């Protein structure tokens, strides 16, 4: 069977969005074929019929949540609908509620997207051997905020076992150095670990952590390896109440994969 998909560049985190309806039990295999055929693709999402009144449902390859893919899907829906500016509502795997993405066309096939990200279900400190590191838990994915105390080789060695320890569907190790971020993400169901060019949920996790640590609202611009993501984390009476992520997405082209 042939499956059509769009290759999209959201701040360098190259994403495939499959528009042909695919059964859930086939999605991991299809994602693997797409990523093997084009090694620049870092993740795959599938468009499905929404359960509610959203424009579409985005189901990620491992059932995880992804902010960059959400902006990508919203940009694709806007482009296909001829919308230059407006709001696109999505259902997204790993998110308990529909997400509203505000899109604005920048030029042909490129959109700026701002999305109200899900709030973390918890921010805590976890022990990993001799290391004690902050963990920001979202529905569908958890992120560990790392510094130079964790080596790259140790990250690559331990990410799978740490994901299991945290009982997470997916795990990001976010190497944060000032305003620079280097994300490493593992998805349990597909057993894939990728040094991503940018990570929206990981950037959001860092902003949430920094705001909680400061006890005050924060607006941060994080330089991911291939672009900047801006996040506004708002606190009211010391409680995190809003996370707004802004990034761009370029629709690069449409492709086919045969299974």
State what each model feature region is.
Residues 110-118:
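Membrane helix-loop-helix hairpins that form the core translocation module of multi-pass transporters
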